[in-house]
Amino acid sequence: MVTGASVDGLVSGMQTSSVIAGLMQVEAAPQTALKTKVSTQQKVVSSYQTINTKMSGLLTAAKALNDPTAWKGATATSSSDAVLATTSTTGSNQTGSVTFKVKSLAAPESRIFSSGSVAATSDSITSSSNISITNTASGEVKNLALTDTSLKGVVDAINGSSDLGVKATAIQLAPGKYTLQLTANDTGAASAFSIGGIDGLGADVAATEGSDAVLTVGTTNTFEISSSSNTFKGLMDGLTITAKAKSGDTDPPITVGVTKDTDGIAAKVQAMVDAANGALSEIAGQTKNASGDVPGGVLAGNSSMQQLSSTILQTVSGGAGALGSLKDVGIELTRDGQLTFDKTKFVSALNADPAKTQSYFNSATDTDGDGIKDGFADKMVGMANKATQSNTGTLAQLITSGNSTIKDLTDRIGDWDVRLAQRQQTLQRQFSAMETALGSLKNQSSWLSGQLAAL
Protein backbone atom coordinates (compact mmCIF):
# COMPACT_ATOMS: atom_id res chain seq x y z
CA MET A 1 0.00 0.00 0.00
CA VAL A 2 1.21 3.53 -0.80
CA THR A 3 1.98 5.74 2.17
CA GLY A 4 2.71 9.45 2.36
CA ALA A 5 3.37 12.24 4.84
CA SER A 6 0.46 14.37 6.14
CA VAL A 7 -0.18 16.76 9.02
CA ASP A 8 -3.05 15.89 11.38
CA GLY A 9 -5.96 18.41 11.40
CA LEU A 10 -4.84 21.59 13.12
CA VAL A 11 -8.35 23.06 12.99
CA SER A 12 -10.58 20.00 13.18
CA GLY A 13 -8.43 18.19 15.71
CA MET A 14 -8.90 14.98 13.71
CA GLN A 15 -6.09 12.39 13.34
CA THR A 16 -6.30 12.78 9.57
CA SER A 17 -3.21 10.62 8.89
CA SER A 18 -4.86 7.72 10.72
CA VAL A 19 -8.13 8.32 8.92
CA ILE A 20 -6.39 8.34 5.53
CA ALA A 21 -4.42 5.20 6.46
CA GLY A 22 -7.64 3.42 7.37
CA LEU A 23 -9.32 4.49 4.16
CA MET A 24 -6.28 3.39 2.11
CA GLN A 25 -6.33 -0.01 3.78
CA VAL A 26 -9.89 -0.45 2.55
CA GLU A 27 -8.94 0.87 -0.90
CA ALA A 28 -5.97 -1.56 -1.06
CA ALA A 29 -8.04 -4.66 -0.26
CA PRO A 30 -8.14 -5.81 -3.93
CA GLN A 31 -4.35 -5.41 -4.20
CA THR A 32 -3.83 -7.34 -0.96
CA ALA A 33 -5.95 -10.14 -2.39
CA LEU A 34 -3.76 -10.17 -5.51
CA LYS A 35 -0.60 -10.40 -3.39
CA THR A 36 -2.10 -13.37 -1.55
CA LYS A 37 -2.80 -15.03 -4.89
CA VAL A 38 0.82 -14.44 -5.98
CA SER A 39 2.12 -16.04 -2.78
CA THR A 40 -0.19 -19.02 -3.24
CA GLN A 41 0.75 -19.42 -6.91
CA GLN A 42 4.47 -19.23 -6.09
CA LYS A 43 4.03 -22.12 -3.67
CA VAL A 44 2.19 -24.09 -6.35
CA VAL A 45 4.95 -23.50 -8.91
CA SER A 46 7.59 -24.43 -6.34
CA SER A 47 5.74 -27.68 -5.65
CA TYR A 48 5.59 -28.49 -9.36
CA GLN A 49 9.32 -27.77 -9.65
CA THR A 50 10.12 -30.07 -6.74
CA ILE A 51 8.09 -32.88 -8.29
CA ASN A 52 9.74 -32.18 -11.64
CA THR A 53 13.16 -32.61 -10.02
CA LYS A 54 12.09 -35.95 -8.57
CA MET A 55 10.73 -37.10 -11.92
CA SER A 56 13.93 -36.00 -13.67
CA GLY A 57 15.86 -38.14 -11.20
CA LEU A 58 13.60 -41.07 -12.05
CA LEU A 59 14.21 -40.45 -15.76
CA THR A 60 17.98 -40.50 -15.26
CA ALA A 61 17.84 -43.70 -13.21
CA ALA A 62 15.55 -45.41 -15.73
CA LYS A 63 17.78 -44.43 -18.66
CA ALA A 64 20.69 -46.15 -16.94
CA LEU A 65 18.77 -49.45 -17.30
CA ASN A 66 17.11 -48.55 -20.58
CA ASP A 67 20.59 -48.55 -22.17
CA PRO A 68 21.44 -52.08 -23.42
CA THR A 69 25.14 -51.57 -22.63
CA ALA A 70 24.27 -51.31 -18.93
CA TRP A 71 23.53 -55.03 -18.98
CA LYS A 72 26.88 -55.95 -20.47
CA GLY A 73 28.79 -54.85 -17.41
CA ALA A 74 31.42 -57.23 -16.12
CA THR A 75 34.12 -57.17 -13.46
CA ALA A 76 37.69 -58.29 -14.08
CA THR A 77 40.04 -59.48 -11.35
CA SER A 78 43.74 -60.32 -11.45
CA SER A 79 45.63 -62.67 -9.16
CA SER A 80 48.70 -60.42 -9.37
CA ASP A 81 49.42 -56.72 -9.00
CA ALA A 82 51.75 -57.11 -11.98
CA VAL A 83 48.73 -57.08 -14.28
CA LEU A 84 45.81 -54.65 -14.51
CA ALA A 85 42.62 -56.12 -16.00
CA THR A 86 39.60 -54.09 -17.14
CA THR A 87 36.40 -54.83 -19.04
CA SER A 88 34.52 -52.94 -21.72
CA THR A 89 32.00 -50.33 -20.60
CA THR A 90 30.26 -50.13 -23.98
CA GLY A 91 30.55 -53.52 -25.65
CA SER A 92 29.96 -57.11 -24.66
CA ASN A 93 32.16 -58.95 -22.18
CA GLN A 94 32.94 -62.66 -22.23
CA THR A 95 32.93 -64.25 -18.81
CA GLY A 96 35.56 -66.80 -17.86
CA SER A 97 39.27 -66.79 -17.02
CA VAL A 98 42.70 -66.93 -18.65
CA THR A 99 46.08 -67.90 -17.15
CA PHE A 100 49.46 -66.64 -18.38
CA LYS A 101 52.90 -65.29 -17.51
CA VAL A 102 54.39 -61.98 -18.62
CA LYS A 103 57.44 -63.09 -20.61
CA SER A 104 58.57 -59.55 -21.48
CA LEU A 105 57.45 -55.95 -21.39
CA ALA A 106 57.36 -53.64 -24.38
CA ALA A 107 60.26 -51.21 -24.75
CA PRO A 108 61.00 -48.33 -27.12
CA GLU A 109 64.09 -48.33 -29.36
CA SER A 110 66.82 -46.12 -27.94
CA ARG A 111 70.09 -45.28 -29.76
CA ILE A 112 73.19 -43.45 -28.48
CA PHE A 113 76.41 -42.12 -30.00
CA SER A 114 78.61 -43.60 -27.29
CA SER A 115 81.88 -43.67 -29.25
CA GLY A 116 82.12 -39.92 -29.73
CA SER A 117 81.44 -36.78 -27.78
CA VAL A 118 81.85 -32.99 -27.63
CA ALA A 119 83.26 -30.91 -24.79
CA ALA A 120 80.14 -28.75 -24.42
CA THR A 121 76.53 -28.92 -25.57
CA SER A 122 77.15 -25.72 -27.53
CA ASP A 123 79.70 -27.53 -29.75
CA SER A 124 78.70 -28.68 -33.23
CA ILE A 125 78.03 -32.40 -33.75
CA THR A 126 77.49 -32.45 -37.52
CA SER A 127 78.58 -30.72 -40.69
CA SER A 128 75.21 -31.45 -42.28
CA SER A 129 72.27 -29.06 -42.34
CA ASN A 130 69.82 -31.95 -42.43
CA ILE A 131 69.27 -35.13 -40.41
CA SER A 132 67.01 -38.10 -41.10
CA ILE A 133 65.17 -40.71 -39.03
CA THR A 134 64.32 -43.97 -40.81
CA ASN A 135 61.83 -46.46 -39.33
CA THR A 136 63.47 -49.85 -39.73
CA ALA A 137 60.20 -51.78 -40.04
CA SER A 138 58.39 -49.60 -42.56
CA GLY A 139 61.33 -47.91 -44.26
CA GLU A 140 59.64 -44.53 -43.84
CA VAL A 141 62.12 -41.64 -43.75
CA LYS A 142 61.54 -38.37 -41.89
CA ASN A 143 63.88 -35.43 -42.57
CA LEU A 144 64.61 -32.43 -40.37
CA ALA A 145 66.42 -29.25 -41.45
CA LEU A 146 68.89 -27.79 -38.94
CA THR A 147 69.65 -24.14 -38.33
CA ASP A 148 71.86 -24.87 -35.32
CA THR A 149 74.23 -27.86 -35.53
CA SER A 150 75.34 -27.76 -31.89
CA LEU A 151 74.35 -30.65 -29.63
CA LYS A 152 71.84 -28.41 -27.87
CA GLY A 153 70.54 -27.07 -31.19
CA VAL A 154 70.00 -30.58 -32.58
CA VAL A 155 68.26 -31.74 -29.39
CA ASP A 156 65.96 -28.71 -29.43
CA ALA A 157 65.16 -29.14 -33.13
CA ILE A 158 64.28 -32.83 -32.75
CA ASN A 159 62.15 -32.27 -29.65
CA GLY A 160 60.44 -29.35 -31.35
CA SER A 161 59.31 -31.54 -34.24
CA SER A 162 56.04 -33.45 -33.79
CA ASP A 163 56.37 -35.98 -36.63
CA LEU A 164 59.85 -37.52 -36.26
CA GLY A 165 58.61 -40.16 -33.83
CA VAL A 166 61.64 -39.77 -31.53
CA LYS A 167 62.81 -37.59 -28.65
CA ALA A 168 66.40 -36.43 -28.11
CA THR A 169 68.53 -36.06 -24.99
CA ALA A 170 71.99 -34.63 -24.43
CA ILE A 171 73.82 -37.24 -22.31
CA GLN A 172 76.94 -36.54 -20.23
CA LEU A 173 79.23 -39.56 -20.57
CA ALA A 174 81.85 -38.04 -18.26
CA PRO A 175 82.90 -34.54 -17.22
CA GLY A 176 83.49 -32.59 -20.43
CA LYS A 177 82.08 -35.36 -22.64
CA TYR A 178 78.58 -34.95 -24.06
CA THR A 179 76.79 -36.99 -26.69
CA LEU A 180 73.36 -37.53 -28.27
CA GLN A 181 70.72 -40.16 -27.43
CA LEU A 182 67.47 -40.67 -29.33
CA THR A 183 64.50 -42.67 -28.04
CA ALA A 184 61.39 -43.70 -29.97
CA ASN A 185 58.08 -42.25 -28.82
CA ASP A 186 56.35 -45.62 -29.17
CA THR A 187 57.22 -49.02 -27.75
CA GLY A 188 57.48 -52.30 -29.64
CA ALA A 189 59.73 -54.00 -32.17
CA ALA A 190 58.33 -51.71 -34.85
CA SER A 191 59.83 -48.70 -33.07
CA ALA A 192 63.36 -49.55 -34.30
CA PHE A 193 64.97 -46.74 -36.29
CA SER A 194 68.25 -45.53 -37.76
CA ILE A 195 69.78 -42.05 -37.76
CA GLY A 196 71.37 -40.23 -40.68
CA GLY A 197 73.19 -36.91 -40.92
CA ILE A 198 75.12 -36.92 -37.62
CA ASP A 199 78.81 -37.16 -38.60
CA GLY A 200 80.56 -35.61 -35.62
CA LEU A 201 79.98 -38.26 -32.97
CA GLY A 202 80.98 -41.49 -34.67
CA ALA A 203 78.61 -44.43 -35.04
CA ASP A 204 75.44 -44.86 -33.02
CA VAL A 205 74.51 -48.08 -31.26
CA ALA A 206 71.32 -49.46 -29.76
CA ALA A 207 71.12 -48.61 -26.08
CA THR A 208 67.80 -50.45 -25.90
CA GLU A 209 66.27 -52.44 -28.71
CA GLY A 210 62.60 -51.85 -29.43
CA SER A 211 60.67 -54.93 -28.33
CA ASP A 212 57.12 -56.16 -27.98
CA ALA A 213 55.44 -57.25 -24.79
CA VAL A 214 54.86 -61.00 -24.76
CA LEU A 215 52.45 -63.15 -22.75
CA THR A 216 52.93 -66.89 -22.44
CA VAL A 217 49.37 -68.20 -22.21
CA GLY A 218 48.52 -71.49 -20.50
CA THR A 219 50.50 -73.79 -18.26
CA THR A 220 51.04 -76.95 -20.35
CA ASN A 221 50.35 -76.51 -24.04
CA THR A 222 51.36 -72.86 -23.97
CA PHE A 223 51.34 -70.30 -26.75
CA GLU A 224 52.56 -66.72 -26.97
CA ILE A 225 50.84 -63.51 -27.93
CA SER A 226 52.61 -60.19 -28.42
CA SER A 227 51.72 -56.51 -28.37
CA SER A 228 53.68 -53.42 -29.37
CA SER A 229 52.59 -51.89 -26.06
CA ASN A 230 52.08 -53.39 -22.62
CA THR A 231 48.34 -53.47 -23.28
CA PHE A 232 46.65 -56.55 -24.72
CA LYS A 233 43.12 -56.55 -26.12
CA GLY A 234 41.03 -59.39 -27.48
CA LEU A 235 42.44 -62.22 -25.38
CA MET A 236 38.82 -62.51 -24.24
CA ASP A 237 35.93 -60.51 -25.70
CA GLY A 238 35.81 -57.13 -23.92
CA LEU A 239 38.90 -57.79 -21.76
CA THR A 240 41.90 -55.44 -21.68
CA ILE A 241 45.09 -56.56 -19.92
CA THR A 242 47.93 -54.17 -19.08
CA ALA A 243 51.21 -55.75 -18.01
CA LYS A 244 53.15 -53.74 -15.44
CA ALA A 245 55.97 -56.13 -14.55
CA LYS A 246 57.72 -59.16 -16.05
CA SER A 247 57.02 -62.51 -14.40
CA GLY A 248 59.95 -64.13 -12.64
CA ASP A 249 60.96 -67.72 -13.36
CA THR A 250 59.61 -68.88 -10.00
CA ASP A 251 56.53 -66.67 -10.02
CA PRO A 252 53.20 -68.52 -10.28
CA PRO A 253 51.09 -67.99 -13.39
CA ILE A 254 48.73 -65.02 -13.32
CA THR A 255 45.00 -65.68 -13.60
CA VAL A 256 42.59 -63.03 -14.81
CA GLY A 257 38.89 -63.74 -14.34
CA VAL A 258 35.84 -61.97 -15.73
CA THR A 259 32.44 -62.28 -14.07
CA LYS A 260 29.08 -60.63 -14.67
CA ASP A 261 28.85 -57.38 -12.69
CA THR A 262 25.64 -58.40 -10.95
CA ASP A 263 26.21 -55.99 -8.07
CA GLY A 264 26.62 -53.06 -10.44
CA ILE A 265 23.45 -53.92 -12.38
CA ALA A 266 21.49 -54.53 -9.17
CA ALA A 267 22.63 -51.12 -7.90
CA LYS A 268 21.14 -49.50 -11.01
CA VAL A 269 17.82 -51.28 -10.40
CA GLN A 270 17.87 -50.18 -6.76
CA ALA A 271 18.57 -46.60 -7.87
CA MET A 272 15.53 -46.63 -10.17
CA VAL A 273 13.31 -48.09 -7.43
CA ASP A 274 14.55 -45.45 -4.98
CA ALA A 275 13.93 -42.69 -7.53
CA ALA A 276 10.39 -43.94 -8.18
CA ASN A 277 9.68 -44.06 -4.44
CA GLY A 278 11.08 -40.56 -4.06
CA ALA A 279 8.74 -39.25 -6.76
CA LEU A 280 5.73 -41.10 -5.31
CA SER A 281 6.42 -39.79 -1.79
CA GLU A 282 6.82 -36.22 -3.03
CA ILE A 283 3.57 -36.33 -4.99
CA ALA A 284 1.74 -37.90 -2.04
CA GLY A 285 2.97 -35.18 0.31
CA GLN A 286 2.13 -32.35 -2.08
CA THR A 287 -1.38 -33.64 -2.89
CA LYS A 288 -2.55 -34.90 0.51
CA ASN A 289 -5.84 -33.51 1.85
CA ALA A 290 -6.15 -31.78 5.20
CA SER A 291 -7.05 -34.04 8.11
CA GLY A 292 -8.08 -32.58 11.44
CA ASP A 293 -5.34 -30.24 12.59
CA VAL A 294 -2.94 -31.50 9.92
CA PRO A 295 -2.92 -29.13 6.92
CA GLY A 296 -3.15 -30.43 3.40
CA GLY A 297 -0.41 -30.22 0.79
CA VAL A 298 0.05 -27.25 -1.51
CA LEU A 299 -1.40 -29.32 -4.37
CA ALA A 300 -4.17 -30.96 -2.33
CA GLY A 301 -6.66 -32.60 -4.66
CA ASN A 302 -4.58 -31.78 -7.77
CA SER A 303 -5.86 -34.28 -10.33
CA SER A 304 -2.88 -33.91 -12.69
CA MET A 305 -0.40 -34.91 -10.00
CA GLN A 306 -2.62 -37.68 -8.69
CA GLN A 307 -2.80 -39.04 -12.23
CA LEU A 308 1.00 -38.90 -12.49
CA SER A 309 1.31 -40.95 -9.31
CA SER A 310 -1.21 -43.47 -10.65
CA THR A 311 0.76 -43.76 -13.89
CA ILE A 312 3.95 -44.65 -12.00
CA LEU A 313 2.11 -47.32 -10.00
CA GLN A 314 0.40 -48.70 -13.10
CA THR A 315 3.77 -48.96 -14.83
CA VAL A 316 4.90 -51.25 -12.01
CA SER A 317 1.71 -53.28 -11.71
CA GLY A 318 1.53 -53.68 -15.49
CA GLY A 319 4.63 -55.85 -15.44
CA ALA A 320 6.81 -56.37 -18.50
CA GLY A 321 4.42 -57.32 -21.26
CA ALA A 322 4.26 -60.99 -22.15
CA LEU A 323 7.10 -61.83 -19.75
CA GLY A 324 4.87 -61.41 -16.73
CA SER A 325 5.14 -59.82 -13.31
CA LEU A 326 8.11 -57.77 -12.12
CA LYS A 327 7.90 -59.86 -8.96
CA ASP A 328 9.89 -62.47 -10.88
CA VAL A 329 12.88 -60.12 -10.85
CA GLY A 330 12.43 -58.87 -7.29
CA ILE A 331 10.25 -55.76 -7.73
CA GLU A 332 6.90 -55.49 -5.94
CA LEU A 333 4.38 -52.88 -4.80
CA THR A 334 3.48 -52.44 -1.15
CA ARG A 335 0.00 -51.58 0.13
CA ASP A 336 1.04 -48.01 0.86
CA GLY A 337 2.06 -47.39 -2.75
CA GLN A 338 5.82 -47.88 -2.57
CA LEU A 339 8.17 -50.16 -4.51
CA THR A 340 10.41 -52.78 -2.91
CA PHE A 341 13.44 -54.47 -4.46
CA ASP A 342 14.70 -57.93 -3.52
CA LYS A 343 18.34 -57.92 -4.68
CA THR A 344 18.86 -61.60 -3.92
CA LYS A 345 15.92 -62.60 -6.11
CA PHE A 346 17.08 -60.28 -8.89
CA VAL A 347 20.66 -61.58 -8.87
CA SER A 348 19.39 -65.15 -8.89
CA ALA A 349 17.25 -64.42 -11.95
CA LEU A 350 20.12 -62.58 -13.66
CA ASN A 351 22.54 -65.45 -13.15
CA ALA A 352 19.98 -68.03 -14.28
CA ASP A 353 18.95 -66.23 -17.48
CA PRO A 354 20.70 -62.89 -18.18
CA ALA A 355 18.90 -62.20 -21.46
CA LYS A 356 15.42 -62.84 -20.05
CA THR A 357 16.11 -60.78 -16.94
CA GLN A 358 17.34 -57.88 -19.06
CA SER A 359 14.18 -58.02 -21.18
CA TYR A 360 12.07 -57.34 -18.07
CA PHE A 361 13.69 -53.90 -18.02
CA ASN A 362 15.00 -53.32 -21.53
CA SER A 363 12.75 -55.12 -23.99
CA ALA A 364 12.78 -55.54 -27.76
CA THR A 365 8.97 -55.71 -28.05
CA ASP A 366 6.21 -53.09 -28.02
CA THR A 367 2.99 -54.94 -27.25
CA ASP A 368 0.84 -51.79 -26.92
CA GLY A 369 2.12 -50.30 -30.17
CA ASP A 370 2.57 -46.92 -28.48
CA GLY A 371 6.22 -46.54 -29.43
CA ILE A 372 7.38 -47.49 -25.93
CA LYS A 373 8.96 -50.91 -25.42
CA ASP A 374 7.54 -53.37 -22.86
CA GLY A 375 10.47 -53.27 -20.43
CA PHE A 376 9.99 -51.69 -17.01
CA ALA A 377 12.84 -49.23 -17.56
CA ASP A 378 11.56 -48.54 -21.09
CA LYS A 379 8.14 -47.61 -19.73
CA MET A 380 9.61 -45.51 -16.93
CA VAL A 381 11.67 -43.53 -19.44
CA GLY A 382 8.63 -42.94 -21.64
CA MET A 383 6.43 -41.91 -18.72
CA ALA A 384 9.04 -39.64 -17.10
CA ASN A 385 9.82 -38.03 -20.45
CA LYS A 386 6.18 -37.10 -20.95
CA ALA A 387 6.15 -35.46 -17.53
CA THR A 388 9.45 -33.57 -17.61
CA GLN A 389 10.22 -32.80 -21.25
CA SER A 390 10.93 -29.11 -21.82
CA ASN A 391 7.98 -27.11 -23.22
CA THR A 392 5.79 -30.15 -23.92
CA GLY A 393 6.03 -32.11 -20.65
CA THR A 394 3.07 -32.09 -18.25
CA LEU A 395 5.09 -30.58 -15.42
CA ALA A 396 6.94 -28.19 -17.71
CA GLN A 397 3.63 -26.82 -18.99
CA LEU A 398 2.20 -26.48 -15.48
CA ILE A 399 5.31 -24.60 -14.34
CA THR A 400 5.20 -22.32 -17.38
CA SER A 401 1.50 -21.65 -16.88
CA GLY A 402 2.03 -20.94 -13.18
CA ASN A 403 4.85 -18.49 -13.87
CA SER A 404 2.69 -16.76 -16.47
CA THR A 405 -0.08 -16.38 -13.89
CA ILE A 406 2.39 -14.93 -11.39
CA LYS A 407 3.59 -12.41 -13.97
CA ASP A 408 0.03 -11.36 -14.78
CA LEU A 409 -0.82 -10.94 -11.09
CA THR A 410 2.40 -9.00 -10.48
CA ASP A 411 1.57 -6.64 -13.35
CA ARG A 412 -1.89 -6.06 -11.88
CA ILE A 413 -0.34 -5.36 -8.46
CA GLY A 414 1.87 -2.77 -10.15
CA ASP A 415 -1.19 -1.12 -11.69
CA TRP A 416 -2.76 -0.96 -8.24
CA ASP A 417 0.36 0.78 -6.88
CA VAL A 418 -0.25 3.64 -9.32
CA ARG A 419 -3.99 3.73 -8.61
CA LEU A 420 -3.52 3.73 -4.84
CA ALA A 421 -0.89 6.47 -4.99
CA GLN A 422 -3.33 8.64 -6.89
CA ARG A 423 -6.14 7.83 -4.46
CA GLN A 424 -3.98 8.73 -1.45
CA GLN A 425 -3.05 12.06 -3.01
CA THR A 426 -6.75 12.76 -3.60
CA LEU A 427 -7.63 11.99 0.02
CA GLN A 428 -4.80 14.18 1.29
CA ARG A 429 -6.02 17.07 -0.89
CA GLN A 430 -9.60 16.58 0.28
CA PHE A 431 -8.67 16.58 3.96
CA SER A 432 -6.40 19.58 3.44
CA ALA A 433 -9.25 21.44 1.76
CA MET A 434 -11.54 20.51 4.65
CA GLU A 435 -9.06 21.94 7.18
CA THR A 436 -8.81 25.13 5.12
CA ALA A 437 -12.60 25.48 5.01
CA LEU A 438 -12.92 24.83 8.74
CA GLY A 439 -10.24 27.44 9.41
CA SER A 440 -12.15 30.00 7.35
CA LEU A 441 -15.38 29.23 9.19
CA LYS A 442 -13.59 29.55 12.52
CA ASN A 443 -12.26 32.97 11.55
CA GLN A 444 -15.73 34.11 10.47
CA SER A 445 -17.18 32.83 13.73
CA SER A 446 -14.60 34.77 15.73
CA TRP A 447 -15.38 37.98 13.76
CA LEU A 448 -19.12 37.61 14.32
CA SER A 449 -18.57 36.98 18.01
CA GLY A 450 -16.54 40.18 18.19
CA GLN A 451 -19.19 42.20 16.39
CA LEU A 452 -21.94 40.91 18.64
CA ALA A 453 -19.91 41.68 21.74
CA ALA A 454 -19.51 45.29 20.54
CA LEU A 455 -23.27 45.92 20.34
Name the predicted role of every residue range.
Residues 47-50:
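Amphipathic, heptad-repeat-like alpha-helical segments
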Residues 446-455:
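Short, charged, intrinsically disordered terminal tails
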Residues 1-39, 52, 56, 60-283, ...:
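Bacterial flagellar/type III secretion structural subunits and associated motility module proteins
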Residues 42-45:
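Juxtamembrane membrane-water interface segments immediately C-terminal to a transmembrane helix
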Residues 419-445:
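C-terminal tails and terminal domains of large nucleic-acid-associated
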Residues 115-116, 442, 449:
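Short, glycine/charged-enriched secondary-structure capping and boundary segments
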Residues 290-292:
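Aromatic-rich transmembrane-lumenal/periplasmic boundary elements in polytopic membrane proteins
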